[in-house]
């Protein structure tokens, strides 16, 4: 964004110095202080366009006296920020992004103090990377990390870092109460993990930078640079509540270092891992509101962080509400009149039926009553009435032309072709919680992706199996409506990859095959969790019988062979770096340096021989 402010805002602030005289303090001098752009020496590095970090108009405003803030100055700041925001929104960064609010809506809610956030720079870095890979039909593929160790080992190889809500729920919550991925952990859990990893990235970046300054220019040129500042992509689950909760969560993510966050269209309180049963979806409009709330919060903060919209409708079979007509074509009902299922179950409970009896009755009821969409009910009704195929096809053609017709309008349309009213109810089979049954599958997922697309930077459809052909069909339909839209694919460890019919060649090319269809961001969400479990299990079993031989064979020798920097874990953790800082502050005391004499890492790790 352009960072300037009209001239009518005072730019020169009087700062007075005083001295005591017989008559009291007197004004001796007046020094002008100018609030403007940061003055930097000319740089050989290319400028960032548009700038991400620069002096903000609000900086000038904050340094005015209180008396000067009222009136013209505040109006000038407000008007300038509106112009800046509008120019920002018209930049290539937000091409194709829809906002149902105005720049004035955002600026009026910002307050007079603006800040800059490092996560916005990381977001620009991610945006540029995704654009570069998308232009080449190549992937940005990464793995979930659960701690700073995994982050540092991925940094030389993966270009982005992923933080999974599943992993946080099962490994590290802010209450230390670990559990399955039901989205019921405190909402600051994943942002805290993001902050932990973001701070670790900065430590290892500083450590690496310091180590390179000790090299000669020739050594620096020949030594590969490790970029520890990889953009972090994080799991926002359902947003953890209503829209105000989404706002606060989005703010926390941006403050803590996340470059991008994904939000899924499941119901808060009914959320399940995307590969579990029992998922409850929210109406299309409700999830769009979450995406808009996230964008609004980040617009208020002036950050470019990326919004990722995820849908679980390929397998989610329940819907929290039927209020959105865009969902109506996929809502299921029954074609015979009967007592509502929920009322029957409540009556059984009041009469003392055992939970197992109630569960068995509900399961049997659903099997006995075929669940169909209203359009399927109309077609069956026309067939039963002996209507000609032309009438059946005509109805199908009309609803295909306008798939967002409500159930009410569909009934009116059906009456044009039927002799008697269609019997169909989506309320009779509602669950005990009041949820509607929903026709999950790729048609529903495709529609939702298209609806979410204008409000999101990337789209993620959670799928039930790894299949390039299915993914390609989905991508083709979505990108026909949203040209160039970038897609996300979860290379989930929940899939039995060995049982999917892959040979080595197709398994190896899977990621790159997907990238040809627009799946530019791909991730193994729980790779860190599984890799840690695997090596720990192997070491634990061997250590039981082999003792230190197992540790040296499985860990130290492998660290040496692979060049893993954690082999010298004191150095990895930054001990020499901190010694350097302390040494710059205070001379002498070399005997108290952590990496001095007595440090067992010093000279200990020569090649290990067996």
UniProtKB/Swiss-Prot annotation:
Localisation: Mitochondrion matrix
Mutant phenotype after disruption: Impairs growth with propionate as the sole carbon and energy source.
InterPro entries for the chain: ICL/PEPM, Isocitrate_lyase, Isocitrate_lyase_ph_CS, Pyrv/PenolPyrv_kinase-like_dom, Pyrv_kinase-like_dom_sf
Predominant place of localization: mitochondrion
Residue numbers spanned by region Disordered: 588-610
Physiological role: Catalyzes the formation of pyruvate and succinate from 2-methylisocitrate during the metabolism of endogenous propionyl-CoA.
Protein name as catalogued: Methylisocitrate lyase, mitochondrial
Native species: Emericella nidulans (strain FGSC A4 / ATCC 38163 / CBS 112.46 / NRRL 194 / M139)
